[in-house]
Amino acid sequence: DTPWHIRDEGIYSLEKGKTHYTSNAGLKELKVEIDHYLDRHYGVSYDPDHEIMVTIGGSEAIDAAMRAMLDPGDEVLIPQPSYVSYVPCAVLAGGVPVIIELKAENEFRLTPEALEAAITPKTKLLVMPFPNNPTGAIMEKKDLEKIADIVREHDLYVISDEIYSELTYLERHVTIASLQGMRDRTIVINGFSKSHAMTGWRLGYACGPRIIIEQMLKIHQF
């Protein structure tokens, strides 16, 4: 269950009449705190006014990002096993899902060799589902650096689904957005469902370059 100190704040907000429309991108106060959290924990910072948007859970953020970034026929690289919504989101956005099978002998991590083999001239986007659902696999910094080199070389974009970032125990989570040259080609997806036991509250967020977040906001609005 959601911890009581969070529920109490929700009750307080209802009692105070905080039930009206907000900015399309979410409460400014929340976006400022999201930026502080990402900067403090992962060394990456975003402009709360233009580079962060609050979404209806992480799933809406994934959907909006794909709709904003994909043209018809663009290929989306999706490592699997992974969250079941990536493929339908890509299809609904007009993209073509390309599955990269993650293997047990590699601890279900995405390898540079597997990534290179999947890239074609039509590849636009790579989904990075780490920490992974359902395998629990993580990508260490040294792993991410090799992936980032390939992403930059092929001028790809990344959707980094980091909803399980607080549920790592042996290695501290590293976001690929914090690596050299990756912030402006990565959309970081996260939220409060897993870290704060708030699955039913549907509270997520996306962070990334202003030009992409602005397009995602149009989709979020309409």
Predicted segment positions?
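Conserved PLP-anchoring active-site segment centered on the Schiff-base-forming lysine
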Residues: 68-90
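A short helix->loop->beta-strand "cap" motif at the edges of active sites that frequently abuts
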Residues: 74, 95, 151-157, 182-184
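A short helix-loop-beta submotif of the ANL/AMP-binding
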Residues: 91-98
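Short acidic capping loops at alpha-helix termini that bridge into adjacent secondary structure
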Residues: 46-52, 72-75, 122, 183-186
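Conserved core segment of the aminotransferase class I/II
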Residues: 179-222
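Active-site phosphate-binding strand-loop segment of PLP-dependent enzymes
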Residues: 98, 102-172
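N-terminal small-domain helix-loop-helix segment of the aminotransferase-like
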Residues: 1-57, 64
